[in-house]
Amino acid sequence: MNNYLRKATVLIVKRGAEYLVGRIPYSMEFRWSTSPYDAWGTRDREKAEAVAGKLGGDLWLWNPVAGQLREYAN
């Protein structure tokens, strides 16, 4: 069970009080949400850092199973 919780943790991008959901199709705009449950998540640190850098956001660790959110520290 503990291993399942660890694998459920993903990196998400937060900018201000909003979380990145994704890019709007056929547009160069991005969709944002106030809920981390809506956020795009990845376990690929390099990809997450690239997206956060491009959008001016910060990386956060998010575990939707446990409902835990905390700032990512390299």
List the model feature ranges, each with a label:
Residues 3, 13-16, 33, 47, ...:
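Accessory DNA-engaging acidic/polar modules
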Residues 39-74:
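Short, mixed-charge low-complexity intrinsically disordered segments
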Residues 1, 21-23, 40-41:
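Mixed-charge, polar/low-complexity N-terminal
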Residues 7-36:
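Short aromatic-glycine-(Arg/Gly/Cys) micro-motifs in beta-strand/loop hairpins
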Residues 5, 34, 63-65:
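Short, ordered beta-strand-loop transition motifs
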Residues 1, 26-29, 45-48:
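Intrinsically disordered, low-complexity boundary segments flanking structured domains
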